[in-house]
Amino acid sequence: METFPSVGSPGLWAGFIAFVIAMLALDLGVFHRKAHVVKFKEALGWSALWVSLALVFGAGVWWKFGPEPGLQFITGYLIEKSLSVDNIFVFVVIFSALRIPALYQHRVLFWGILSALALRAIMIFAGVAMLARFHWLIYVFGGFLIITGVKLFLQRNKEDNPEEGALMRLARRTIPSTPNFDGHHFFTVENGRKLATPLLMALLLVEASDILFALDSIPAIFAVTTDPFIVFTSNIFAILGLRSMFFMLAGAVEKFSYLKVGLSAVLVFVGTKMAIIDFVKMPPEVSLSVIAGLLGASIVASLIKSRHAPTSDADAPKV
Protein backbone atom coordinates (compact mmCIF):
# COMPACT_ATOMS: atom_id res chain seq x y z
CA MET A 1 0.00 0.00 0.00
CA GLU A 2 1.23 3.47 -0.86
CA THR A 3 2.38 5.60 2.06
CA PHE A 4 3.30 9.24 2.48
CA PRO A 5 6.92 10.26 3.18
CA SER A 6 7.58 11.30 6.77
CA VAL A 7 10.36 12.98 8.72
CA GLY A 8 9.50 10.85 11.75
CA SER A 9 11.89 8.00 12.49
CA PRO A 10 10.99 5.24 15.00
CA GLY A 11 13.22 6.97 17.53
CA LEU A 12 11.43 10.30 17.10
CA TRP A 13 8.03 8.64 17.44
CA ALA A 14 9.09 6.83 20.61
CA GLY A 15 10.67 9.96 22.06
CA PHE A 16 7.62 12.13 21.41
CA ILE A 17 5.19 9.59 22.87
CA ALA A 18 7.42 9.20 25.95
CA PHE A 19 7.45 13.00 26.33
CA VAL A 20 3.64 13.16 26.19
CA ILE A 21 3.26 10.38 28.78
CA ALA A 22 5.79 12.06 31.10
CA MET A 23 4.03 15.45 30.88
CA LEU A 24 0.62 13.90 31.56
CA ALA A 25 2.04 12.00 34.55
CA LEU A 26 3.53 15.22 35.94
CA ASP A 27 0.26 17.06 35.37
CA LEU A 28 -1.99 14.61 37.21
CA GLY A 29 0.47 13.03 39.63
CA VAL A 30 2.35 16.14 40.79
CA PHE A 31 0.88 19.51 39.84
CA HIS A 32 -2.82 18.56 40.10
CA ARG A 33 -2.65 15.71 42.57
CA LYS A 34 -5.16 17.50 44.78
CA ALA A 35 -8.28 19.09 43.35
CA HIS A 36 -8.15 22.88 43.34
CA VAL A 37 -9.63 25.78 41.43
CA VAL A 38 -7.29 26.70 38.58
CA LYS A 39 -6.78 30.47 38.71
CA PHE A 40 -6.02 32.70 35.74
CA LYS A 41 -2.36 33.16 36.67
CA GLU A 42 -1.75 29.41 36.91
CA ALA A 43 -3.58 28.79 33.64
CA LEU A 44 -1.58 31.54 31.94
CA GLY A 45 1.66 29.95 33.10
CA TRP A 46 0.68 26.52 31.82
CA SER A 47 -0.53 27.99 28.51
CA ALA A 48 2.77 29.81 28.05
CA LEU A 49 4.64 26.58 28.81
CA TRP A 50 2.70 24.52 26.27
CA VAL A 51 3.01 27.15 23.54
CA SER A 52 6.74 27.52 24.26
CA LEU A 53 7.27 23.75 24.07
CA ALA A 54 5.40 23.63 20.75
CA LEU A 55 7.47 26.47 19.31
CA VAL A 56 10.72 24.87 20.49
CA PHE A 57 9.62 21.60 18.90
CA GLY A 58 8.74 23.41 15.67
CA ALA A 59 12.13 25.13 15.69
CA GLY A 60 13.75 21.72 16.13
CA VAL A 61 11.83 20.34 13.15
CA TRP A 62 12.92 23.38 11.10
CA TRP A 63 16.57 22.99 12.12
CA LYS A 64 16.67 19.22 11.57
CA PHE A 65 14.53 18.82 8.44
CA GLY A 66 14.36 22.25 6.83
CA PRO A 67 11.97 25.22 6.63
CA GLU A 68 9.12 23.45 4.83
CA PRO A 69 8.41 20.81 7.53
CA GLY A 70 8.97 23.49 10.18
CA LEU A 71 6.39 25.82 8.63
CA GLN A 72 4.01 22.91 8.13
CA PHE A 73 4.21 22.08 11.84
CA ILE A 74 3.60 25.69 12.90
CA THR A 75 0.69 26.08 10.45
CA GLY A 76 -0.89 22.80 11.56
CA TYR A 77 -0.45 23.78 15.20
CA LEU A 78 -2.05 27.18 14.57
CA ILE A 79 -5.03 25.61 12.79
CA GLU A 80 -5.64 23.10 15.57
CA LYS A 81 -5.08 25.69 18.30
CA SER A 82 -7.53 28.14 16.74
CA LEU A 83 -10.23 25.54 16.12
CA SER A 84 -9.86 24.28 19.70
CA VAL A 85 -10.93 27.73 20.91
CA ASP A 86 -14.39 26.87 19.61
CA ASN A 87 -14.19 23.81 21.87
CA ILE A 88 -13.78 26.16 24.82
CA PHE A 89 -17.14 27.79 24.05
CA VAL A 90 -18.73 24.33 24.24
CA PHE A 91 -16.91 23.39 27.47
CA VAL A 92 -18.19 26.57 29.13
CA VAL A 93 -21.76 25.69 28.15
CA ILE A 94 -21.38 22.08 29.35
CA PHE A 95 -19.98 23.01 32.77
CA SER A 96 -22.54 25.76 33.22
CA ALA A 97 -25.53 23.60 32.21
CA LEU A 98 -24.48 20.70 34.46
CA ARG A 99 -23.39 23.05 37.26
CA ILE A 100 -19.95 21.47 37.53
CA PRO A 101 -18.00 23.17 40.37
CA ALA A 102 -14.80 24.90 39.27
CA LEU A 103 -12.96 22.68 41.77
CA TYR A 104 -13.56 19.57 39.61
CA GLN A 105 -13.47 20.98 36.09
CA HIS A 106 -9.77 20.23 35.61
CA ARG A 107 -10.36 16.54 36.43
CA VAL A 108 -13.12 16.28 33.82
CA LEU A 109 -10.98 17.99 31.18
CA PHE A 110 -7.90 15.89 32.01
CA TRP A 111 -9.65 12.57 31.44
CA GLY A 112 -11.61 13.94 28.51
CA ILE A 113 -8.48 15.13 26.76
CA LEU A 114 -6.56 11.95 27.67
CA SER A 115 -9.12 9.90 25.76
CA ALA A 116 -9.09 12.54 23.01
CA LEU A 117 -5.36 11.96 22.49
CA ALA A 118 -5.93 8.26 21.77
CA LEU A 119 -8.91 9.04 19.55
CA ARG A 120 -6.98 11.67 17.58
CA ALA A 121 -4.14 9.20 16.97
CA ILE A 122 -6.58 6.65 15.54
CA MET A 123 -8.31 9.25 13.34
CA ILE A 124 -5.02 10.70 12.07
CA PHE A 125 -3.53 7.35 11.05
CA ALA A 126 -6.84 6.26 9.51
CA GLY A 127 -7.00 9.53 7.56
CA VAL A 128 -3.41 9.20 6.34
CA ALA A 129 -4.04 5.60 5.24
CA MET A 130 -7.22 6.54 3.36
CA LEU A 131 -5.60 9.50 1.60
CA ALA A 132 -2.63 7.36 0.58
CA ARG A 133 -4.98 4.85 -1.04
CA PHE A 134 -7.74 7.13 -2.29
CA HIS A 135 -6.32 10.49 -3.35
CA TRP A 136 -9.75 11.75 -4.42
CA LEU A 137 -10.74 11.89 -0.74
CA ILE A 138 -8.75 15.13 -0.52
CA TYR A 139 -11.53 16.78 -2.53
CA VAL A 140 -14.18 15.27 -0.24
CA PHE A 141 -12.37 16.63 2.81
CA GLY A 142 -12.05 20.02 1.13
CA GLY A 143 -15.75 20.20 0.31
CA PHE A 144 -16.62 19.08 3.84
CA LEU A 145 -14.51 21.87 5.36
CA ILE A 146 -16.06 24.51 3.08
CA ILE A 147 -19.57 23.38 4.06
CA THR A 148 -18.58 23.27 7.74
CA GLY A 149 -17.12 26.78 7.54
CA VAL A 150 -20.28 28.18 5.96
CA LYS A 151 -22.43 26.36 8.53
CA LEU A 152 -20.32 27.73 11.39
CA PHE A 153 -20.78 31.26 10.05
CA LEU A 154 -24.56 30.90 9.66
CA GLN A 155 -24.96 29.35 13.13
CA ARG A 156 -22.39 31.52 14.92
CA ASN A 157 -25.00 32.99 17.29
CA LYS A 158 -26.85 29.74 17.98
CA GLU A 159 -26.65 28.33 21.51
CA ASP A 160 -27.48 24.71 22.31
CA ASN A 161 -28.39 23.27 25.68
CA PRO A 162 -26.33 20.08 26.17
CA GLU A 163 -28.84 18.72 28.69
CA GLU A 164 -31.43 18.53 25.91
CA GLY A 165 -29.11 16.82 23.41
CA ALA A 166 -29.56 13.28 22.12
CA LEU A 167 -26.35 12.04 23.78
CA MET A 168 -27.40 13.24 27.23
CA ARG A 169 -30.88 11.75 26.87
CA LEU A 170 -29.38 8.43 25.78
CA ALA A 171 -26.83 8.46 28.61
CA ARG A 172 -29.47 9.10 31.25
CA ARG A 173 -31.64 6.30 29.89
CA THR A 174 -28.82 3.75 29.79
CA ILE A 175 -26.56 4.80 32.69
CA PRO A 176 -28.07 4.95 36.21
CA SER A 177 -27.20 8.42 37.46
CA THR A 178 -27.76 10.91 40.25
CA PRO A 179 -27.83 14.71 40.25
CA ASN A 180 -25.69 14.66 43.40
CA PHE A 181 -21.90 15.08 43.47
CA ASP A 182 -19.53 12.88 45.46
CA GLY A 183 -16.37 14.94 45.52
CA HIS A 184 -14.24 14.37 42.43
CA HIS A 185 -15.64 10.89 41.77
CA PHE A 186 -17.35 9.94 38.51
CA PHE A 187 -19.44 7.31 40.33
CA THR A 188 -21.05 7.13 43.76
CA VAL A 189 -23.18 4.70 45.77
CA GLU A 190 -26.67 5.66 46.92
CA ASN A 191 -28.98 3.19 48.66
CA GLY A 192 -26.71 0.33 47.63
CA ARG A 193 -26.74 1.30 43.92
CA LYS A 194 -23.72 2.46 41.94
CA LEU A 195 -24.67 5.64 40.11
CA ALA A 196 -22.94 8.04 37.76
CA THR A 197 -22.44 11.58 39.07
CA PRO A 198 -22.79 14.74 36.94
CA LEU A 199 -19.00 14.61 36.45
CA LEU A 200 -19.35 11.49 34.29
CA MET A 201 -22.11 13.14 32.24
CA ALA A 202 -19.88 16.16 31.70
CA LEU A 203 -17.01 13.86 30.69
CA LEU A 204 -19.19 12.12 28.09
CA LEU A 205 -20.21 15.47 26.61
CA VAL A 206 -16.60 16.72 26.56
CA GLU A 207 -15.50 13.58 24.70
CA ALA A 208 -18.41 13.82 22.26
CA SER A 209 -17.64 17.46 21.50
CA ASP A 210 -14.00 16.60 20.83
CA ILE A 211 -15.04 13.93 18.33
CA LEU A 212 -17.11 16.50 16.45
CA PHE A 213 -14.32 19.07 16.43
CA ALA A 214 -11.77 16.44 15.36
CA LEU A 215 -13.85 15.89 12.22
CA ASP A 216 -13.03 19.51 11.30
CA SER A 217 -9.50 19.95 12.55
CA ILE A 218 -7.85 16.75 11.31
CA PRO A 219 -8.92 17.14 7.65
CA ALA A 220 -7.86 20.80 7.90
CA ILE A 221 -4.29 19.81 8.78
CA PHE A 222 -4.20 17.43 5.81
CA ALA A 223 -4.46 20.55 3.65
CA VAL A 224 -1.09 21.61 5.06
CA THR A 225 0.78 18.29 5.05
CA THR A 226 0.23 14.55 4.80
CA ASP A 227 3.35 13.74 6.83
CA PRO A 228 1.93 11.58 9.68
CA PHE A 229 4.55 12.78 12.16
CA ILE A 230 3.90 16.49 11.50
CA VAL A 231 0.12 16.00 11.56
CA PHE A 232 0.24 13.99 14.79
CA THR A 233 2.68 16.14 16.75
CA SER A 234 1.06 19.48 15.82
CA ASN A 235 -2.36 18.10 16.75
CA ILE A 236 -1.22 16.63 20.06
CA PHE A 237 0.66 19.78 21.14
CA ALA A 238 -2.48 21.85 20.56
CA ILE A 239 -4.66 19.39 22.49
CA LEU A 240 -2.24 19.24 25.43
CA GLY A 241 -2.59 23.00 25.90
CA LEU A 242 -6.37 23.01 25.63
CA ARG A 243 -7.10 22.62 29.37
CA SER A 244 -4.94 25.55 30.45
CA MET A 245 -6.34 27.65 27.62
CA PHE A 246 -9.85 26.86 28.85
CA PHE A 247 -9.15 28.13 32.36
CA MET A 248 -7.43 31.19 30.93
CA LEU A 249 -10.25 32.16 28.54
CA ALA A 250 -13.40 30.64 30.09
CA GLY A 251 -14.45 33.88 31.71
CA ALA A 252 -13.84 35.94 28.59
CA VAL A 253 -15.24 33.86 25.71
CA GLU A 254 -18.10 36.28 25.15
CA LYS A 255 -15.60 39.04 24.36
CA PHE A 256 -14.48 37.18 21.22
CA SER A 257 -17.69 37.84 19.33
CA TYR A 258 -16.08 37.71 15.88
CA LEU A 259 -13.86 34.69 16.51
CA LYS A 260 -16.32 32.24 14.96
CA VAL A 261 -16.37 34.43 11.85
CA GLY A 262 -12.59 34.12 11.68
CA LEU A 263 -12.73 30.36 12.27
CA SER A 264 -15.33 29.92 9.54
CA ALA A 265 -13.12 31.89 7.14
CA VAL A 266 -10.15 29.67 8.05
CA LEU A 267 -12.18 26.51 7.36
CA VAL A 268 -13.37 27.84 3.99
CA PHE A 269 -9.81 28.86 3.06
CA VAL A 270 -8.34 25.49 4.06
CA GLY A 271 -11.15 23.61 2.30
CA THR A 272 -10.56 25.62 -0.87
CA LYS A 273 -6.83 24.93 -0.62
CA MET A 274 -7.57 21.20 -0.48
CA ALA A 275 -9.99 21.40 -3.42
CA ILE A 276 -7.38 23.02 -5.70
CA ILE A 277 -4.31 21.26 -4.32
CA ASP A 278 -3.59 19.44 -7.61
CA PHE A 279 -3.89 22.63 -9.65
CA VAL A 280 -2.43 25.39 -7.46
CA LYS A 281 0.55 24.78 -5.19
CA MET A 282 0.44 27.17 -2.23
CA PRO A 283 3.72 27.62 -0.32
CA PRO A 284 3.54 26.88 3.44
CA GLU A 285 4.45 30.49 4.32
CA VAL A 286 1.46 31.77 2.31
CA SER A 287 -0.94 29.40 4.11
CA LEU A 288 0.48 30.39 7.49
CA SER A 289 0.19 34.12 6.68
CA VAL A 290 -3.42 33.85 5.48
CA ILE A 291 -4.57 31.78 8.48
CA ALA A 292 -2.76 34.00 10.98
CA GLY A 293 -4.17 37.10 9.26
CA LEU A 294 -7.77 35.84 9.36
CA LEU A 295 -7.53 34.86 13.02
CA GLY A 296 -5.70 38.03 13.99
CA ALA A 297 -8.28 40.23 12.25
CA SER A 298 -11.19 38.46 14.00
CA ILE A 299 -9.51 38.79 17.42
CA VAL A 300 -8.69 42.48 16.93
CA ALA A 301 -12.23 43.20 15.72
CA SER A 302 -13.65 41.35 18.74
CA LEU A 303 -11.49 43.29 21.20
CA ILE A 304 -12.44 46.61 19.58
CA LYS A 305 -16.12 45.71 19.82
CA SER A 306 -15.88 44.54 23.45
CA ARG A 307 -14.00 47.70 24.42
CA HIS A 308 -16.82 49.90 23.15
CA ALA A 309 -19.67 47.67 24.32
CA PRO A 310 -21.37 48.36 27.68
CA THR A 311 -20.70 45.66 30.29
CA SER A 312 -22.23 44.74 33.59
CA ASP A 313 -21.65 42.13 36.25
CA ALA A 314 -24.94 40.54 35.35
CA ASP A 315 -23.70 39.83 31.85
CA ALA A 316 -20.52 38.11 32.98
CA PRO A 317 -20.45 34.41 32.07
CA LYS A 318 -20.64 32.01 34.98
CA VAL A 319 -18.44 28.94 34.92
Swiss-Prot record:
Classification via Pfam families: TerC (PF03741)
Matching InterPro entries: Integral_membrane_TerC (IPR005496), Integral_membrane_TerC_rswitch (IPR022369)
Main location: membrane
Coiled coil: none
GO cellular component terms, A-Z: plasma membrane
Localisation: Cell membrane
PANTHER family: MEMBRANE BOUND PREDICTED REDOX MODULATOR (PTHR30238), THYLAKOID MEMBRANE PROTEIN TERC, CHLOROPLASTIC (PTHR30238:SF0)
Family: Belongs to the TerC family.
Protein name according to UniProt: Uncharacterized membrane protein STKORF319
Organism (species): Myxococcus xanthus
